[in-house]
Amino acid sequence: VDRRQRQMCIRDSLFNQLVQTEQWQQASVIGLTMSDGLEWETRPIIEQAWKEGKKVAVPKAIKKGSQMDFRQIDSFDQVEAGFAGISEPDPDQTRSLAPEEIDLLVVPGRVFTPEGYRIGFGGGFYDRYLAKFDNPTISLVWQGQLTDNLPTDQYDLPVQELLISQL
């Protein structure tokens, strides 16, 4: 099995775990990033959310203050190349959602501890957003992304639940 096939199997395993969680099933609005090749492919998750009648919110980076504005997308046509080449919602075609309007946030990361602490992709965008987000958070993790400890500070907030693929 080549690396790409293995990654697709892991992604599919994590995707299936996610859509079976109580948090997913109870959520009306899902927040998650548009994948850019460094994290798990999120388009199938977004498509599944739409298929189930859920709303989807994806972040637009606001460089000043390293903030994120999650905006509802109803189609991939509402997405454009944004900050650092990452796909982001077009603000002219989408509406901003407040953190409390998002029922479940799927948080990306490179490395995780079993307690949910993470190293992201730099910039602290998600750490700042998590500080004002009170609803459930989940990360999709391959066992190779787990480590026993990471340096943390007072700004680091753990993800509430890790879905871990054993593949």
Task: Give residue spans per PLM region.
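Active-site/ligand-binding-proximal alpha/beta "capping" segment
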Residues: 110
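Glycine-rich helix-loop-beta junction characteristic of Rossmann-like nucleotide cofactor-binding loops
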Residues: 21-24
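Short, amphipathic alpha-helical "lid/cap" segments that border enzyme active or binding sites
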Residues: 11-19
